[in-house]
Amino acid sequence: MEHRIFGIESEFGLSYVPHGLGRLSIEESAAALFKPVLDQWRSTNVFLPNGGRLYLDVGSHPEYASAECGSIDELLAQERAGELLFADLARTARKRLLAGSEGRPLDGELYLFKNNVDSAGNSYGSHENYLISRKLQFNDLIAQLVPFLVTRQILVGAGKTHPNGGPVPGSTDPASSTGVPSYSFSQRADHIWEAASTSTSRARPLINTRDEPHADASKFRRMHVINGDSNMAEPTTLLKIASTDLVLRMLEDRFPVTSLDIVSVPAALRAISHDLTGTATFETTDGKHYTALSVQRHYLDAARQYVQQYGAHHHHVEYALDLWQRTLDAIESGDYSSIDSEIDWAIKKKLLDAYIARARAAGQPADYASARIRQLDLAYHDIDPERSVFHALVRRGAVKRILPEGAAEAAKTQPPNTRALQRSRFINAAVAAGEQFTVDWVHLKLNAYPQHTLVCKDPFATDSEGLEEVLTLLEGKARQHQEAAFPPPC
């Protein structure tokens, strides 16, 4: 596709930590967090004026789905806006709880973590969405994309400590562990069980194959990748989306890339994640063995050739290719200094290793099983800008930024220049008019005027037939609403 729509859905971990007496269950914490949303929108599943969606997912996991984005810059801003929106809600909830909104004052902290595994070992996801053409052979595309997704974690994993070590090599028991504290590339790799499936929780595949394009089904399909880690660093998210987009473009244009049939996707994911040298091997059905480094170098070489032949289709392509190259070189050499301000797993590893080194220099035992290290691992993913370890690193200049100052804050209310603009204009107009409405990714409906329901099947379109008529209707209602509230003096 010459142009592509992108989106990311991020689930967040939620925890309430009291300063004294008083506890909140996860359900009560979620209810406190979403109270302003429920008060304003009468629901905990809402589309926002910025075009994105805010909702409470299964298991009381707060989730933000970005609006449809037509560029990586829009996507980075939208994803970060979701973090800021939830951070705002958490601060509001804390004030309400302290004021006694639950019947008694509760003094504590409401934490939201942009990670993928909680303390009980439950996993929650970061789902990527890529619009593709309906003309493609979907199953063939999946088969060719799988080797890339299995090995991509060495580039864009969020990193994770394992106090009891990783799984025993070759073991099929998910509870097995080596007993040696360790660090892995990925948080999600230990929780994925197959290549493709219609399930998102029971089987946890790399790719969710449910056919829900949220667009004209005769033209488009949605590639729904659900095995990725949630990223904090903007360069890591950029590389994740840009590299996957390039691979999809190569496959769409039938550009020659590797085609590997992996014997066991779960085993390959785990072996790769827990080997920071990048040399752990996985087997293919033809009896050959490959490493993540070798496979990713093949994709990178192909991407460079593709860009040389077809040209760069956005201004981040050269940076993405360079970061891709530097990350593979860093893994091969074992020297992460060239990427430890851009790639999440390397940024966090540098932070944790520095603490371990200081503790040991002071004569204190420390490793990846230490309580303080586990705390730092979690604190890296805290989304509160004032409290987060990650954001402290950003303020110190230890993490590279991609977005210009203010872009994410603006994206809390401003939609991307896609179909999201239609949704935003409709929502703002309906709110101003005091009209009840129902919105999803494709439909815009005024509950009192169902005959004016808009069907927006083109995710690229910023306008559609009937939109201006509905907006004019709502503007008239808004004027009536205002005149009724503030009648002119006699």
Curated annotation (Swiss-Prot):
Keywords: ATP-binding, Ligase, Magnesium, Metal-binding, Nucleotide-binding, Ubl conjugation pathway
Metal-binding as UniProt keyword: yes
Residue numbers binding ATP: R53, S66, W441
UniProt-recorded name of the protein: Pup--protein ligase
Entry function: Catalyzes the covalent attachment of the prokaryotic ubiquitin-like protein modifier Pup to the proteasomal substrate proteins, thereby targeting them for proteasomal degradation. This tagging system is termed pupylation. The ligation reaction involves the side-chain carboxylate of the C-terminal glutamate of Pup and the side-chain amino group of a substrate lysine.
Keyword ATP-binding assigned: yes
Note from the entry: The reaction mechanism probably proceeds via the activation of Pup by phosphorylation of its C-terminal glutamate, which is then subject to nucleophilic attack by the substrate lysine, resulting in an isopeptide bond and the release of phosphate as a good leaving group.
Gene Ontology terms: biological process: modification-dependent protein catabolic process; proteasomal protein catabolic process; protein pupylation
EC number in record: 6.3.1.19
Molecular function in Gene Ontology: ATP binding; ligase activity, forming carbon-nitrogen bonds; magnesium ion binding; ubiquitin-like protein transferase activity
NCBIfam families: pupylate_PafA
Family: Belongs to the Pup ligase/Pup deamidase family. Pup-conjugating enzyme subfamily.
Reactions catalysed according to its record: ATP + [prokaryotic ubiquitin-like protein]-L-glutamate + [protein]-L-lysine = ADP + phosphate + N(6)-([prokaryotic ubiquitin-like protein]-gamma-L-glutamyl)-[protein]-L-lysine
Pfam families linked: Pup_ligase (PF03136)
Domain of life: Bacteria
Binding annotation for Mg(2+): E9, Y55, E63
Active site: D57
Disulfide links within the chain: none
InterPro entries reported for this sequence: Pup_ligase, Pup_ligase/deamidase
Biochemical pathway: Protein degradation; proteasomal Pup-dependent pathway; Protein modification; protein pupylation
Taxonomic path: Bacteria, Bacillati, Actinomycetota, Actinomycetes, Micrococcales
Region (Disordered): 160-181
EC class (word): ligase
